[in-house]
């Protein structure tokens, strides 16, 4: 115990305990004096008692008067003279740290010791005489001073104690005195035997004498009184401290009396502290010391101004440290080990509390957690006492569950509190203030409109103010971004770590991609080299073989010529010799091939093996060996053996077997309800790539078979089929290729914590994302991990199909869009799957053959002999068709029919029976005799009739009629694929189909955004053709563009260039980029320009974003110099304007003229232009200089003519005088000397359809 208390004291002296477990135990050093909130500081009693072991005093031992104290002369400094034995002993204790030499004490210490020895009793006596303290206080304080004699006091019942002990349990019966003749006997009170001995009762009576608490105000009054009459500060503090110490001792005696008065503990349960006392009692910290220490900690924190919750928590930590220390002693650990282990647990508690306090902005959550845990621990301890030993593990388990439940509740409360404090409330306040500011701006604008005299000035000031606000907001945003960067003045740690981890992940991915690319290049290079080497080896081998043949021919030629002298005979002999040698070499090569085949026989003889054998026999054996021999090539062919084994293993695997089919979606269903489902993101697409290897062919075939098995079914176990899957409570629903979209009535999208930063870098909207901490609701994430959640209720998610194989990354509703490119899961609480009924989708995938022609073909081929053959073939066909029956939970039965070729079909039981009955040799329904009877006009002898004449045209016409009837024009093309000519009948069907498709997407709304969208949709066919995509794909793309983006583009077009940022940095530009289809000809700039053109058409405002200035001319005028500017617009027209240099208010847009390309006609509005219309195109800068922008923002590569020098004031000589340069919409204009030119004659009227503004 002494070692533990010394450790605590050392930590107090260092000031460590406050930073670890109980920093509250230390405050001021003895040389420091401070003041509390009440004007004084009594110091820390444990520190003071450790510094000055006991108050030194001078008291007459012979005196029996406990209230009379002799005054002794006090000498300050010099030697310390002991006055009695106790005084001498305490002086020795005090100078123990000074090498046992009193002279080593400083003057201050000597003075303090003498004042403590003489002043305390004198001061106490003075306070008692002047009535500052009562007799019981003087008795309590005087009894604590060494040598002091306390007089007997009257025994009183114990009263209220500040130790928070139960009032009823604290009342002890003191009316009946104990029997002192039998100390160990049972104490009897009023005839009732108690559980205490007479000795224990006597101790209780002594402890409860005069235990009324002393008011804390008495110590302060005594402190002030002593200072006011001239006592020194150490004396005043010592007396005040003694009064407070006396109060603590009173409370501890009351606690001791209460502990003794309690009944015996149940013998089956021994408290941990009692067990520790029994095993190692000398080191155990007593309950009294524990309570006193906790109270001191609590008071110290209250004195420092800490809240009550914090003080309670720190006091509890101190008690927890002592409890853990005692418990570790009980487990057999040494005092040092027990202390270290206890401190480690306290450290963990502090780390947890520090994290909670840092998050919550204070210690309230930590204090609440501590209070919850203390209450649970207390309840569990009470249950443990009453529970037999065999059932106590259940109590412990119940306690842990309760603690975990409380922790979870606190975490959820904390998450909600933080979300409200740091997200919801700031955003609401900001939006409220923005609304107020907007209202004030509107009011200022109305003032300008209502007062024509100062209208221009007020509106100019309002516009300037808005521009300044925008610039200031942009500057603030840039400053915040700079501060959040690791190199800025301030770094957000969370963003910093997220950025570092994201950059590291991207770096790792790029590195892996580079490595894979290098490996692929290396493999391709090796393959090319191997192929080149192989070709070179075969070429050299054949060259060597030809050399052998040539040498044989030369040898024979020489011999025959030498023997006969006949050149023709020698030449003939040479040809025969060469032919014989070539045949010999061929036989040898065949023999080598047979040898190699025998060696590689177990591998089989696929194409690659045959090729290798041919190569080996040609180039690596026989007389014409080139490169490696057969032995050196064994390793290469071992790899081929392994490759072949891999293929065989793949072939042996079955696609999917023993599937637990729980439900089948009927083939006629177009809408499927979904509840409590979830889909993994991103969505899977469809690939039409051809397999490049044999393994890829096998895997693709297996996946196709697996899709056929699980499509439109709810499966009990997860199966990888390449289809998108909705995971529900009762199984996994595999979405077919016929699906169109998912409509989410109520649902959420979940993102990883790093997604928001990536989306913000990509300029994507993240306003719907809300940060959460996983408290167990996301099974796939660890507890405590952060993630983002977005409400997807009311959104629609388009699904990929074979016609649109690339999955979209955007969900939309009528107003907003939500990018899900970085999400990992979509949760659907209530939704609907919209799809084309599978029975109709199959018809599109496998068009029906014209029934009439099939019927005629069958009748023409009918005969008795062929009928028998047909029956046999029919049986074989039926054997090749597999069927599987499924029963839904509602009892309905469906049959899946899978033929060797084609797409499996699901049909009802009756439909399946009828269909299989009619299966013939060609898998087309055989014609029954009844059918033959009903069509007698069809002759059986096709050879002697002309009924087949014109059948081709009839067949085509019938097919087109059927297509037109069902409205499926997407399967047709207008042009004949063979001659490139447009087929009128097909074109009409396709046009009708596209027209219906467009009408389905038109909106009945009259808002500007809806009108702009309808304008785009009405031209969908031509736009889609220019982008190289289908009309359906184009319409799907436009339907994903939210109204908010169109509204933003309208505002952007109306804003002056100086007040708007670059197009590529806007939200709408990134939104358009996210919805683009997978097309080589579609780019963000062209689509953006197309939308701005339609905005211009609908709003009758010029397109100020994509215009391109073609030329500028400066011409003289009678009054001033006017500048004529010709500007090409994205609509295919040219806009001409006249302006006065350096006077922006004097600009006249004359009109638009046709330029190269097809113009977009602007309809005449028939109304006056609005006051807020742009005065001139955004990039028209008056003055003789060409505008500095010089670039189309939507076409970065297009530049203006490099004419940046000053323009001469001389008339332009490009156009003859008096001749019109262009024919405009309704009027003409010529430069110069045109009597109708601006400034010379009457002011011209705006052109028909003109939508700009004229300003003079």
From Swiss-Prot:
Please list every transmembrane segment annotated in the UniProt record, as residue ranges.
Answer: none
Disulfide-bond pairs as recorded: none
Record: glycosylation sites: 36, 44, 104, 130, 606, 1094
User: In which compartments does the protein localize?
Assistant: Spore polar tube
Classification from the root reads: Eukaryota, Fungi, Fungi incertae sedis, Microsporidia, Unikaryonidae
- The signal peptide stretch is 1-15
Q: Which UniProt keywords apply?
A: Glycoprotein, Signal, Sporulation
Which organism is this entry from?
Encephalitozoon cuniculi (strain GB-M1)
Query: Mind telling me what this protein is named?
Result: Polar tube protein 3
Q: Where is the composition biased (Basic residues)?
A: 67-76
This protein's gene is called PTP3
Residues of the region (Disordered) are 18-44, 59-85, 1178-1256
- What does the subunit comment say? Interacts with PTP1 and PTP2.
Q: Name one GO biological process term.
A: sporulation resulting in formation of a cellular spore
> What does the UniProt function comment say about this protein?
Involved in the sporoblast-to-spore polar tube biogenesis. Plays a role in the control of the polar tube extrusion as part of a specific response to ionic stimuli.
This protein's GO CC annotations: polar tube
């Amino acid at each position: 115990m002494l070692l533990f208390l010394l450790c605590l004291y050392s930590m107090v002296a260092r000031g460590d305990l406050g930073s670890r477990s109980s920093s509250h135990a230390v405050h001021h050093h003895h040389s420091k004096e401070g003041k509390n909130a009440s004007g004084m500081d009594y110091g820390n009693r444990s520190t003071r008692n450790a510094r000055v072991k006991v108050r030194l005093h001078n008291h007459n031992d012979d005196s029996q008067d406990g209230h009379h104290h002799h005054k002794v002369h006090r000498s300050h400094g010099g030697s310390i003279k002991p006055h009695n034995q106790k005084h001498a002993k305490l002086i020795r204790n005090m100078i123990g740290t000074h090498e046992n030499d009193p002279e080593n004490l400083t003057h201050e210490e000597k003075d303090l010791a003498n004042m403590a020895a003489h002043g305390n009793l004198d001061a106490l006596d003075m306070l008692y005489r002047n009535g500052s303290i009562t007799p019981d206080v003087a008795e309590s304080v005087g009894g604590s001073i060494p040598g002091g004699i306390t007089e007997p006091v009257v025994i009183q019942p114990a009263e209220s104690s500040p130790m928070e002990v139960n009032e009823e349990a604290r009342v002890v019966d003191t009316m009946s005195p104990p029997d002192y003749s039998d100390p160990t006997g049972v104490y009897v009170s009023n005839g009732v035997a108690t559980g205490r001995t007479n000795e224990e009762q006597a101790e209780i009576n002594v402890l409860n004498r005069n235990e009324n608490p002393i008011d804390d105000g008495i110590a302060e009054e005594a402190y002030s009184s002593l200072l006011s009459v001239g006592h020194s500060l150490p004396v005043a503090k010592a007396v005040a401290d003694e009064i407070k110490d006396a109060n603590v001792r009173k409370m501890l005696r009351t606690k001791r009396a209460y502990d003794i008065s309690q009944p015996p503990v149940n013998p089956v349960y021994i408290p941990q502290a009692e067990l520790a006392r029994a095993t190692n009692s000398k080191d155990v910290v007593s309950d009294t010391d524990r309570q006193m220490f906790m109270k001191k900690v609590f008071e110290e924190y209250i004195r420092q101004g800490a809240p009550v919750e914090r003080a309670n928590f720190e006091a509890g930590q101190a008690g927890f440290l002592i409890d853990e220390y005692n418990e570790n002693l009980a487990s057999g650990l040494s005092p040092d080990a027990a202390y270290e282990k206890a401190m480690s647990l306290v450290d963990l508690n502090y780390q947890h509390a520090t994290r909670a306090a840092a998050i919550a902005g204070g210690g309230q959550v930590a204090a609440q957690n501590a209070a919850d845990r203390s209450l649970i621990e207390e309840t569990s301890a009470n249950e443990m006492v009453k529970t037999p030993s065999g059932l106590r593990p259940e109590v412990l388990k119940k306690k842990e569950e309760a603690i975990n439940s409380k922790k979870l509740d606190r975490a959820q409360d904390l998450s909600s509190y933080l979300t409200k404090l740091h997200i919801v409330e700031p955003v609401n306040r900001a939006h409220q203030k923005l609304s107020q500011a907007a209202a004030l701006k509107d009011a200022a604008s109305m003032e300008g409109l209502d007062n024509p005299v100062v209208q221009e000035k007020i509106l100019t000031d309002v516009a300037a103010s808005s521009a300044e606000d925008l610039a200031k907001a942009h500057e603030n945003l840039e400053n915040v971004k700079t501060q959040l960067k690791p190199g800025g003045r301030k770094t957000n740690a969370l963003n910093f770590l997220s950025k570092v981890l994201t950059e590291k992940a991207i770096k790792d991915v790029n590195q892996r991609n580079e490595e894979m690319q290098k490996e692929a290049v290396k493999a391709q290079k090796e393959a090319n080299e191997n192929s080149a080497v192989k070709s070179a080896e075969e070429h050299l081998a054949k060259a060597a073989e030809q050399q052998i043949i040539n040498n044989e021919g030369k040898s024979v030629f020489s011999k025959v010529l030498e023997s006969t002298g006949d050149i023709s005979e020698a030449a003939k002999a040479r040809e025969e010799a060469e032919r014989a040698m070539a045949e010999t070499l061929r036989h040898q090569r065949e023999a080598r091939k047979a040898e190699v085949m025998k060696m590689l026989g177990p591998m089989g003889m696929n194409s690659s093996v045959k090729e290798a054998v041919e190569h080996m026999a040609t180039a690596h054996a026989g007389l014409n060996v080139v490169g490696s021999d057969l032995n050196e090539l064994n390793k290469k062919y071992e790899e081929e053996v392994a490759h072949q084994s891999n293929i065989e293993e793949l072939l042996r695997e079955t696609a999917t077997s023993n599937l637990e089919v729980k439900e089948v979606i009927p083939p006629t269903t177009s809408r499927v309800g979904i509840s409590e489902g979830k889909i993994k993101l991103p969505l899977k697409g469809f690939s039409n790539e051809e397999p490049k290897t044999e393994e890829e062919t096998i895997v693709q075939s297996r996946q196709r078979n697996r899709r056929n098995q699980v499509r439109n079914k709810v499966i009990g176990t997860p199966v990888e089929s390449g289809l998108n899957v909705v995971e529900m409570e009762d199984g996994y629903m595999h979405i077919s290729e016929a699906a169109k979209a998912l409509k989410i009535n109520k649902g959420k999208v979940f993102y990883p914590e790093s997604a928001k930063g990536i989306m913000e870098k990509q300029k994507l909207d993240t306003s719907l994302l809300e940060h959460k901490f996983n408290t167990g609701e996301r099974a796939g994430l660890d507890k405590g991990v952060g993630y983002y959640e977005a409400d997807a209720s009311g959104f629609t998610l388009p699904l990929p199909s074979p016609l649109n194989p690339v999955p979209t990354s955007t969900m939309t509703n009528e107003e907003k869009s939500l990018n899900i490119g970085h999400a990992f899961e979509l949760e659907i609480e209530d939704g609907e799957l919209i799809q084309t009924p599978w029975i109709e989708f199959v018809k599109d995938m496998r068009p029906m053959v014209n029934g009439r022609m099939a019927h005629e073909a069958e009748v023409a081929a009918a005969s008795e002999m062929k009928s028998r053959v047909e029956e046999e073939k029919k049986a074989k066909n039926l054997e090749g068709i597999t069927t599987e029956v499924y029963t839904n939970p509602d009892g309905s039965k469906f049959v899946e029919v899978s033929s060797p070729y084609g797409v499996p079909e699901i049909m009802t039981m009756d439909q399946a029976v009828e269909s299989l009955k009619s299966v013939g040799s060609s898998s087309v329904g055989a014609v029954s005799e009844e059918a033959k009877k009903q069509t007698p006009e069809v002759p059986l002898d096709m050879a002697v009739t002309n009924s087949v004449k014109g059948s081709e045209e009839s067949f085509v016409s019938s097919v087109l009629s059927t297509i037109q009837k069902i409205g499926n024009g997407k399967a047709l093309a207008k042009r004949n694929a063979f001659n490139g000519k447009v087929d009128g009948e097909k074109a009409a069907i396709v046009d009708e189909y596209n027209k219906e498709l467009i009408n389905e997407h038109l909106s009945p709304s009259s808002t500007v955004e809806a009108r702009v969208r309808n304008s785009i949709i009405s031209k969908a066919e031509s736009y889609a053709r220019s982008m190289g995509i289908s009309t359906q794909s184009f319409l799907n793309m436009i339907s994903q563009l939210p109204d908010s983006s169109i509204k933003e583009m309208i505002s952007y077009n109306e804003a002056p260039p100086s007040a708007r940022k670059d197009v590529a940095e806007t939200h709408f530009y990134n939104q358009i980029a996210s919805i683009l289809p997978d097309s080589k000809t579609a780019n963000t700039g062209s689509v953006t320009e197309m939308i701005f053109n339609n905005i211009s058409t609908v709003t009758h405002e010029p397109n100020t974003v994509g215009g391109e200035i073609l030329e500028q001319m400066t011409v003289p005028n009678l009054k001033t110099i006017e500048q004529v500017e010709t500007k090409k617009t994205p609509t295919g027209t040219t806009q001409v304007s006249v302006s006065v240099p350096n006077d922006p208010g004097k600009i006249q847009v004359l009109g638009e003229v046709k330029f190269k390309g097809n113009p977009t006609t602007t309809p005449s509005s028939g109304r006056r232009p609005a006051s807020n219309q742009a005065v001139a195109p955004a990039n028209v800068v008056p003055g003789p200089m060409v505008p500095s922008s010089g670039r189309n923002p939507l076409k970065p590569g297009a530049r203006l003519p490099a004419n940046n020098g000053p323009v001469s004031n001389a008339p332009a000589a490009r156009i003859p005088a008096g001749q019109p340069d262009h024919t405009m919409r309704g009027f003409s204009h010529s430069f110069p000397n045109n009597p109708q030119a601006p400034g010379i004659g009457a002011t011209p009227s705006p052109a028909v359809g003109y939508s700009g503004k004229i300003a003079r």
